[in-house]
Amino acid sequence: MQTSSRTYDYRRLKAEYKQLSASSSTDKAMHRLREAVHAVNILLPTPITLEMALLSADGVRKLVRGQSLARTYSACLRNLECLSRHVPGRGNPGLDAVVETHRENAQRVADTCAAALLHMYMSIGTGRTDAFVEHAIQLTAATETAMSDIALVERALGLTHPHNERSPASMDESTGMKNCAVLSHMNDNKDDAVNMEPGYNTTIDRLISSPLLSQSKRERTIISTPAVTPKDNCPPVKFSRENNLITEL
């Protein structure tokens, strides 16, 4: 009987509940935010604080974007460090060109990430570039980055690379205009005359629009046209902007 009474008394005890602390989840979130701020500050000339990053929801979203760009930038630096250990001329001869191509692509992606992050935090009126930054993050976060799209990002950010500027010969080959006169793109000025004779330089004006530019600007490219040989059977022409006529010489 004594045993049963003890059991009965034990069952009548009130259940006690202990409130679990939510500090563990909060600490994890704060740790991730501090990591993001640290990653972004590596690329910023003027570091930001955690309080500055958490002032608004837009600030938090900007911090997430910046961390994504900073991580991709760090990955590119690690790839460049590994590729720098390659010594040209040793081992497989065909490996040198592949390593050089990967090195150029990694450097371009790293420069693009750094420029996008700097523009996002250091420029004025960054609300206009939200869509552009999202696009840049999607490009750089892809497993196989399309370098043609990176070229568009470079142009929008104002980055210049020597390999982006094609020579006149390569432009003639890409457009299929070998040993023939090139017709220039007409602009608004109709008083200028463009000499399209072979052996002369041709000026082409292109209108460039970018979300980062307050207004469109023109880019001028000079193309050298090769001389025409008799076998080409392509007569020289001269284009005049006054009457919009093409006449054979």
From Swiss-Prot:
InterPro entries: Herpes_UL51. The keyword Phosphoprotein applies. Keywords: Host cytoplasm, Host Golgi apparatus, Phosphoprotein, Virion, Virion tegument. Phosphorylated. It is found in: Virion tegument; Host cytoplasm; Host Golgi apparatus. Its main location: virion. Pfam families: Herpes_UL51 (PF04540). GO terms for cellular component: host cell Golgi apparatus; viral tegument. Belongs to the herpesviridae UL51 family. Plays several roles during the time course of infection, including egress of virus particles from the perinuclear space and secondary envelopment of cytoplasmic capsids that bud into specific trans-Golgi network (TGN)-derived membranes. Oligomerizes. Interacts with MDV019; this interaction mediates MDV019 incorporation to virions. This is Tegument protein UL51 homolog. It comes from Gallid herpesvirus 2 (strain Chicken/Md5/ATCC VR-987). The gene is MDV065.
